[in-house]
Amino acid sequence: MAFSVVILAAGKGTRMKSSMPKVLHPIGAKPMVQRIIDTVHQLGAASINLVYGHQAEQLQQALGHNALNWCLQAEQLGTGHAVQQAVPHISDDEDVLILVGDAPLIKANTLHNLLQVKNNADVALLTVNVADPTGMGRIIRQGDNVTAIVEHKDASDAQRQICEINTGMMVLNGKDLKRWLANLNSNNAQGEFYLTDVIEMAANEGKVIKAAQPNSEIEVEGINNRKQLAAIERAFQFEQAQELMMQGVSLLDPHRFDLRGDIIVGQDISIDVNVVIEGTVKIGSNVTIGPNCILKDCEIADGATIEANSMLDQAIVGENCSVGPYARLRPGAVMHENARVGNFVEMKKTTLGKGSKANHLTYLGDTTVGIGANIGAGTITCNYDGVNKSKTIIGDGAFIGSNSALVAPVQIGNMATVGAGSVVTKTVADQELAIARAKQRNVSGWQRPTKPE
């Protein structure tokens, strides 16, 4: 049967102590509610209804690219009242999957199983057994059938001993749901309209109510404060790490690895501790990544090595290249095979040719370096005059001496040499030597200044 989805995301989230809506706080660098939306898309829902109540502008800015029905809950009168706001978008002849917006680790296969259970029942609930159910709604059963969900504050002492709890997620027929919602009342300790009361209504009508459970309790754990946010983040990251290891990636410590985007991997990759992956990163085979590296929207080819404490952003690293330690490749940095960038080298909009190297203490911006060139320590390409950026071209086999400044626009020819300490402002032809520095003068008999006694 066709189904639509209602995501409850109207809570104030006061315990987060944040000006940002709770459901926009990130898990793996993505808003938690976006993760739920992405999961729902895998199931083929006919429509997604988002019930919101606070900071609408922030929510729409973050989630506006999704095809959503926006359902405003102006007053926070309970979960039943929240679902009522989506009623105009619910059809009688479809099932309705109700989800909570603060449980981002829910899996598509768990929701698929829940929908399958609904095919053989009138109502399907997602429940879970926990060691400490304090504060949670208890599942009341008669045999295999669920007869009610009792909120903790309304539960008797005997009911509070039950460890099977409500997750807030369920599937109901649209026509039945609308009828039950219309009959809700707020005669309870909280003075709210409980969505859970529809379960008792269904039971009183003799409806068949079945339950499904997730593979892991973490799938349905909600987030109400920063401590829980951090715990869910770590659980998510460890889950990603386990998946990568099953794909053949060696993680020296899977508890100290962060994937905040997507990664495409080859074989025999070794990743040290505290590596962060952001955006979309593609890593070839036989790649080694040292500790404390940040890789964002990069491509790293087979056999490359990224040494410790290096940062790569929108960079392309060719086969058997070496980067770092302490290197920074900014957007537009391209290294061809067997090139090397060493410690404290920064590249931006720069191509480093096959076998070329800049081993230390260098800035290369808006630069093209040919094949087999050597860039000495302390070399700077002066690419910005305060208004415009200009290019530097360094030819094949060129040798740039240490502590040189190449003032763009400038071109260094093939096999040309620049003497150490030079400030080069004009073209250096192929195989020429350029020396652009003050002539050394030695003063004999010179006396150092001394401090007065």
Swiss-Prot record:
* Pathway named in the protein's UniProt entry: Nucleotide-sugar biosynthesis; UDP-N-acetyl-alpha-D-glucosamine biosynthesis; N-acetyl-alpha-D-glucosamine 1-phosphate from alpha-D-glucosamine 6-phosphate (route II): step 2/2; Nucleotide-sugar biosynthesis; UDP-N-acetyl-alpha-D-glucosamine biosynthesis; UDP-N-acetyl-alpha-D-glucosamine from N-acetyl-alpha-D-glucosamine 1-phosphate: step 1/1; Bacterial outer membrane biogenesis; LPS lipid A biosynthesis
Q: Which residue intervals make up region (Pyrophosphorylase)?
A: 1-226
- Molecular function GO terms recorded: glucosamine-1-phosphate N-acetyltransferase activity; magnesium ion binding; UDP-N-acetylglucosamine diphosphorylase activity
* Residue ranges of the region described as N-acetyltransferase: 248-453
Q: Where in the cell is it found?
A: Cytoplasm
Q: Which residues hold UDP-N-acetyl-alpha-D-glucosamine?
A: 8-11, 22, 73, 78-79, 137, 151, 166, 224, 330, 348, 363, 374
Any GO BP annotation: lipid A biosynthetic process
Q: Which cofactor does it need?
A: Mg(2+)
Primary residence: cytoplasm
PROSITE patterns per UniProt:
HEXAPEP_TRANSFERASES
- State the Pfam families in the record: Hexapep_2, NTP_transf_3
Binding positions (acetyl-CoA): A377, N383, Y384, S402, A420, R437
Q: One GO CC annotation, please?
A: cytoplasm
Q: Where is this region: Linker?
A: 227-247
Q: Which reaction does it catalyse?
A: alpha-D-glucosamine 1-phosphate + acetyl-CoA = N-acetyl-alpha-D-glucosamine 1-phosphate + CoA + H(+); N-acetyl-alpha-D-glucosamine 1-phosphate + UTP + H(+) = UDP-N-acetyl-alpha-D-glucosamine + diphosphate
Summarize where Mg(2+) binds, as residue positions.
D102, N224
Subunit field text: Homotrimer.
| Protein purpose | Catalyzes the last two sequential reactions in the de novo biosynthetic pathway for UDP-N-acetylglucosamine (UDP-GlcNAc). The C-terminal domain catalyzes the transfer of acetyl group from acetyl coenzyme A to glucosamine-1-phosphate (GlcN-1-P) to produce N-acetylglucosamine-1-phosphate (GlcNAc-1-P), which is converted into UDP-GlcNAc by the transfer of uridine 5-monophosphate (from uridine 5-triphosphate), a reaction catalyzed by the N-terminal domain.
Q: What protein family is recorded?
A: In the N-terminal section; belongs to the N-acetylglucosamine-1-phosphate uridyltransferase family.
What is the protein name stated in its UniProt record?
A: Bifunctional protein GlmU
